[in-house]
């Protein structure tokens, strides 16, 4: 099996790990009911999306 030719330096290791971070979801206020919801998703509180009632309660 192949083995690494050189040891990975601290800088290279840290540069690689800069992308291993948590991402904050894009939260927006629902224009229909005012609850916070994920953008481009149906509102869980009222079931509306783009001004239309998608989820019948």
Curated annotation (Swiss-Prot):
Classification lineage: Bacteria, Bacillati, Bacillota, Bacilli, Bacillales
Protein origin, superkingdom: Bacteria
Descriptive protein name: Large ribosomal subunit protein bL32
A GO term for molecular function: structural constituent of ribosome
InterPro entries attached to this UniProt entry: Ribosomal_bL32, Ribosomal_bL32_bact, Ribosomal_zn-bd
Record NCBIfam families: rpmF_bact
Protein family membership: Belongs to the bacterial ribosomal protein bL32 family.
Keyword DNA-binding carried by entry: no
């Amino acid at each position: 099996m192949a083995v690494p030719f050189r040891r990975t330096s601290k800088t290279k290791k840290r540069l690689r790990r800069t992308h291993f971070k948590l991402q904050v979801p894009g939260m927006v206020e629902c224009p229909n009911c005012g609850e916070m919801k994920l953008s481009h998703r149906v509102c869980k509180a009222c079931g509306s999306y783009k001004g239309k009632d998608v989820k019948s309660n």
